[in-house]
Amino acid sequence: MVKLEELDFKPKPIDEHFLENDKDYPVTGQHNGHDVRAEGMQRLDADGKPYPTKLGIHGTHVAVDWDCCIADGACMDVCPVNLYEWNLNPGKSGTGNDHKIQKGSEEWNKYRTDKCDPVRESDCIFCMACESVCPVRAIKITP
């Protein structure tokens, strides 16, 4: 798990209106059966500095801002339907992800941390547990 103090950026909560803002959050691709928005686009962190990644927002009804996500894993622990997996560790979930990313590696430069992937987005029961537990508010549930 990554500590906020160790980051070289300041996470900003997911834009609650991203679905209504096609200009800033256009659908740029698909990943594991869900839409990806703003991938490859430079966005700013809470300090107004460019995020070190350009990974975008993954999902629609269960959306995770991958530029903000710090791989805490709490969302996975509280989800009653297990809709999340680690992107770099398919099939794995929960805190303390198994796949450690070394600083300076190719994966580090691309992702910075593993990412919480809403691979079973359609299974969501809209309990909002993941949204409420995320320490950086990277998740937005839209029923």
From Swiss-Prot:
Residues 60-89, 115-143 form the 4Fe-4S ferredoxin-type domain. Changing E106A: In strain: HO-62. Keywords: 3Fe-4S, 4Fe-4S, Electron transport, Iron, Iron-sulfur, Metal-binding, Repeat, Transport, Zinc. NCBIfam families: ZFX_Thplmales. Its cofactor is [3Fe-4S] cluster; [4Fe-4S] cluster; Zn(2+). [3Fe-4S] cluster binds at C69, C75, C134. Ferredoxins are iron-sulfur proteins that transfer electrons in a wide variety of metabolic reactions. PANTHER family: ADENYLYLSULFATE REDUCTASE, BETA SUBUNIT, L-ASPARTATE SEMIALDEHYDE SULFURTRANSFERASE IRON-SULFUR SUBUNIT. Pfam families: Fer4. Binds 1 [3Fe-4S] cluster. GO terms for molecular function: 3 iron, 4 sulfur cluster binding; 4 iron, 4 sulfur cluster binding; electron transfer activity; oxidoreductase activity; zinc ion binding. [4Fe-4S] cluster binds at C79, C124, C127, C130. This is Zinc-containing ferredoxin. Residues 13-60 are annotated as: N-terminal extension.
